Amino acid sequence: MQVNENPNKVPVELNRTSLYLGLLSVLVLGILFSSYFFN
C-alpha cells in the first residue's frame, strides 16, 4: 500500500501546480481586463 501511495502523490502535486498556475493566469487576466475597462 505504501509503494502505491507514492506514485499517487506525484500526479496530485502536478495537478496542484497546474491548478495554481490556472488561478494565477485567471487573476492576471482579470487584472488586465479590469484595468482595460477602468481606463
UniProtKB/Swiss-Prot annotation:
One of the components of the core complex of photosystem II (PSII). PSII is a light-driven water:plastoquinone oxidoreductase that uses light energy to abstract electrons from H(2)O, generating O(2) and a proton gradient subsequently used for ATP formation. It consists of a core antenna complex that captures photons, and an electron transfer chain that converts photonic excitation into a charge separation. This subunit is found at the monomer-monomer interface and is required for correct PSII assembly and/or dimerization. This is Photosystem II reaction center protein L. It is found in: Cellular thylakoid membrane. PSII is composed of 1 copy each of membrane proteins PsbA, PsbB, PsbC, PsbD, PsbE, PsbF, PsbH, PsbI, PsbJ, PsbK, PsbL, PsbM, PsbT, PsbX, PsbY, Psb30/Ycf12, peripheral proteins PsbO, CyanoQ (PsbQ), PsbU, PsbV and a large number of cofactors. It forms dimeric complexes. Keywords: Membrane, Photosynthesis, Photosystem II, Reaction center, Thylakoid, Transmembrane, Transmembrane helix. Its main location: membrane. InterPro entries: PSII_PsbL, PSII_PsbL_sf. It is a single-pass membrane protein. The keyword Secreted does not apply. It comes from Prochlorococcus marinus subsp. pastoris (strain CCMP1986 / NIES-2087 / MED4). HAMAP family: PSII_PsbL. One of its GO terms (cellular component) is plasma membrane-derived thylakoid membrane. The gene is psbL. GO terms for biological process: photosynthesis. Belongs to the PsbL family. The lineage of its organism: Bacteria, Bacillati, Cyanobacteriota, Cyanophyceae, Synechococcales. The chain crosses the membrane at residues 18-38.
